[in-house]
């Protein structure tokens, strides 16, 4: 985790805009996990893991694209490997698009569609109003 934070810090100094997409396996906030009270000592929601994500989206200034446009709960991207967990939506939001601050204003919409499923993870789809230049 520390190596990735160092990498993000190094990239930030390049003064370019970046979007980092992937599964961080950390539910940062209470609304990113269904049963947060029971999960405070579980991997993926441990205080040091959440503090690491807080540092990335706080002190380091990166932006969580989903939370930029939605503060709703029950938006999860991963469920334990059993049908009942998914049926009851006992999920975690482990998947992120983390942006450099300059891209914040371009986020228009974000969603985690549960179908179709290609793995245990739902895709995080973010719409940007941004013209890509090469």
Can you describe what each PLM-predicted range is?
Residues 66-69, 102, 114:
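Residues at the C-termini of beta-strands that transition into short coil/loop
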Residues 79-80, 107-114:
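Short, solvent-exposed helix-loop connector elements
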Residues 62, 95, 107, 123:
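A residue-level signal for beta-strand positions that form part of recognition/binding surfaces
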Residues 111-134:
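Surface polyanion/phosphate-binding segment centered on an Asp-His-Pro turn
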Residues 103-106, 133-134:
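Short helix-loop capping/hinge motifs at secondary-structure junctions, enriched
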Residues 2-90, 94:
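Metal-dependent phosphoesterases centered on the DNase I-like endonuclease/exonuclease/phosphatase
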Residues 98:
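Hydrophobic alpha-helical positions that pack around
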């Amino acid at each position: 985790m520390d190596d990735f934070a160092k990498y993000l810090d190094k990239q930030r100094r390049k003064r370019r805009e970046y979007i980092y997409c992937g599964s961080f396996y950390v539910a940062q906030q209470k609304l990113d996990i269904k049963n947060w009270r029971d999960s405070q000592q579980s991997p993926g929601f441990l205080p040091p893991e959440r503090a690491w994500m807080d540092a990335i989206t706080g002190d380091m200034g990166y932006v969580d694209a989903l939370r930029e446009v939605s503060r709703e709960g029950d938006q999860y991207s991963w469920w334990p490997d059993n049908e009942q967990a998914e049926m009851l939506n006992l999920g975690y939001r482990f998947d992120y698009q983390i942006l450099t601050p300059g891209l914040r204003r371009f986020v228009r919409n974000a969603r985690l569609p549960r179908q179709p499923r290609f793995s245990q993870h739902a895709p995080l789809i973010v719409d940007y109003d941004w013209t890509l230049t090469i």
